[in-house]
């Protein structure tokens, strides 16, 4: 039985203008519905394949601030979200999340600033700007992850070392086991290795489920580690 907070998303492309750039994203063509059957779902694919666009639309349609944060965040520094949020309908489950967070690597600085401005006696500031970029990013993620929560993460590995990615991996896995749901855009072969997750690939002109070993993130990393010198010779010397 599917007991996820967001069980799926249904697309209505008639609500998108005929000249919208969204019509040019190959992976979106023909897609009518995506199902989220597991506590952890990954979106993978090449840059510009539409994965972050869809995650952002899911976040906005579900009530999150487009730039990130909780549903209570109301700030805006630059309005960049697409019209896709108006063309999707979220299929919600019978459970209601107790907490939620939309975390974006590209707007992390703005969110961290808002976290400090929203701080009070009961919720003191974690002073994210006094930490290194990677430390503050991981701290923000960890401080806002709880059981029975809904978390949408866009490239959370961007600021993290491989070791810190493993730390985040453990936290995500534990929270998912305790009733949380994660939908994550990533290029990280480390995060993608979390057991029992669904992986949606946005490459080859369609959105489809794939295995970990079939992701480009895994294949390119494996190729480089196992054949580094040969690969460098081909790339750098022709």
Question: Where are the regions that the model predicts?
Answer:
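The conserved Walker
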Residues: 46-47
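Conserved D-loop beta-strand region of ABC ATPase nucleotide-binding domains
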Residues: 154, 184-185
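ABC ATPase nucleotide-binding domain signature region
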Residues: 40-42, 53-117
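Conserved glycine(s) of the Walker
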Residues: 50
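N-terminal pre-Walker A segment at the start of P-loop NTPase domains
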Residues: 1-32, 37
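GG-anchored amphipathic helix commonly corresponding to the ABC/SMC/Rad50 NBD signature/C-loop
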Residues: 131-155, 163-175
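C-terminal lobe/lid and adjacent interdomain/linker elements of RecA-like ASCE P-loop ATPase modules
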Residues: 163-181, 188-238
């Amino acid at each position: 039985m599917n007991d996820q907070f967001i069980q799926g998303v249904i697309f209505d492309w008639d609500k998108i203008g005929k000249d919208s750039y969204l019509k040019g994203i190959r992976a979106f063509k023909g897609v009518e519905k995506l199902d989220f059957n597991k506590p952890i779902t990954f979106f993978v694919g090449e840059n510009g394949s539409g994965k972050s666009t869809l995650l952002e639309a899911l976040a906005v349609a579900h009530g999150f601030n487009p730039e990130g944060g909780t549903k209570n965040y109301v700030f805006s520094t630059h309005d960049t979200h697409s019209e896709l949020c108006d063309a999707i309908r979220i299929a919600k489950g019978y459970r209601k999340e107790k907490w939620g967070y939309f975390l974006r690597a590209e707007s992390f600085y703005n969110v961290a600033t808002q976290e400090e401005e929203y701080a009070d006696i009961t919720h003191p500031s974690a002073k994210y700007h006094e930490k290194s970029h990677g430390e503050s990013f991981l701290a923000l993620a960890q401080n806002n992850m709880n059981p029975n929560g809904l978390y949408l993460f866009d490239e959370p590995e961007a600021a993290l070392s491989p070791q810190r990615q493993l730390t985040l991996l453990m936290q995500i896995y534990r929270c998912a086991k305790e009733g949380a749901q994660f939908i994550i855009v990533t290029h990280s072969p480390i995060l993608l290795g979390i057991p029992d997750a669904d992986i949606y690939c946005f490459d080859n002109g369609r959105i489809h489920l794939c295995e970990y070993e079939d992701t480009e993130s895994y294949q390119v990393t494996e190729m480089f580690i196992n054949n580094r010198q040969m690969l460098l010779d081909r790339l750098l010397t022709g």
